[in-house]
Regions:
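Stable alpha-helical structural segments in soluble proteins, enriched in small hydrophobic residues
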Residues: 46-50, 85, 103, 191-202
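Surface "functional belts" at beta-alpha junctions
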Residues: 22, 34, 89-188, 217, ...
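Glycine-rich phosphate-binding loop signature in dinucleotide/nucleotide-binding domains
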Residues: 50-55, 106, 152-156, 202
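DPxDG-like acidic metal-binding loop motif
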Residues: 63-90, 95
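Acyltransferase
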Residues: 182-240
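N-terminal beta-alpha supersecondary unit
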Residues: 1-64, 188
Length: 240
């Protein structure tokens, strides 16, 4: 099975192709260019390099969040469009799970974290045992102090991955000496991790439905928060 995967949930973007569980090829760009300009081009270039045509792809996947609202929308829209045009399965996977699948090099506890701004991180942690990934909590948005409370009773090394790894490490190391910061190249969101997460979903018997793929933002966008605050003020004014 050939899986084409998109990752555009943060600053970097990429595409990857997985062939029967083995990475066939991957592109990665961290130049700051707009994902809407680069993502499909990278996927097309990768398929040509691998001597594949769009009709050769058996399934498509995208990082469905959490992450940048715009980036997640671009990636999921690209995956859904590709799937609908070819009538193939489409999988939306957790950005956090994909990061751990792409970075885990040994058994242990992995804490995936993305900088969510406003003194928060998008976070989930996982255990890797005998090479198999086990989720320990749902994806969520946490303040750093809340993350500390959640991790403080773990008495094993905790490997940090994601673009929020350095933030968590620098903020919490004094209180959590078990923290371990993985090298920078392993902390980036990668399309290969998305492909591996999609392969795991397929192996588990999940059916990828493009119509059911929706972004998982975990919290409201800034525009939505501002609109809600405006509505609250208007309601308060009406009640005076």
């Amino acid at each position: 099975m050939k899986i084409l995967a998109f990752e555009s949930s943060a600053k970097a973007a990429g595409a990857a192709i997985l062939l029967d569980g083995t990475l066939l090829g991957e592109t990665f760009l961290n130049s700051g260019l707009t994902h809407s300009r680069t993502l499909l081009q990278m996927a097309g270039d990768l398929m040509r390099t691998c001597e594949l045509k769009p009709c050769d792809i058996d399934a498509v996947a995208a990082a469905a969040g959490p992450g940048s609202f715009t980036g997640v929308r671009i990636g999921t829209a690209a995956a859904k469009g590709f799937a609908w045009g070819r009538d193939i399965p489409c999988y939306g996977v957790s950005t956090l799970e994909a990061m751990v699948r792409g970075a885990a090099m040994c058994d242990g506890i992995y804490c995936a974290c993305m900088d969510a701004r406003r003194d928060q991180v998008y976070q989930a942690h996982f255990a890797v045992l005998d090479g198999k990934l086990h989720r320990l909590c749902p994806d969520r948005a946490l303040a750093l102090d809340e993350l500390y409370e959640d991790l403080k009773n773990i008495e094993k090394p905790i490997f940090l991955v994601g673009d929020g790894a350095s933030l968590c490490y620098n903020s919490l190391l004094d209180r959590l000496p078990e923290l371990r910061l993985l090298p920078e190249h392993l902390c980036q969101q990668r399309a290969s991790g998305v492909a591996l997460a999609a392969q795991a979903a397929i192996d588990a018997g999940n059916v990828g439905d493009a119509a059911a793929l929706v972004p998982n933002y975990l919290r409201l966008s800034q525009a939505e928060r501002e609109r809600n605050e405006k509505l609250k003020r208007e309601v308060c004014n009406l009640q005076k």
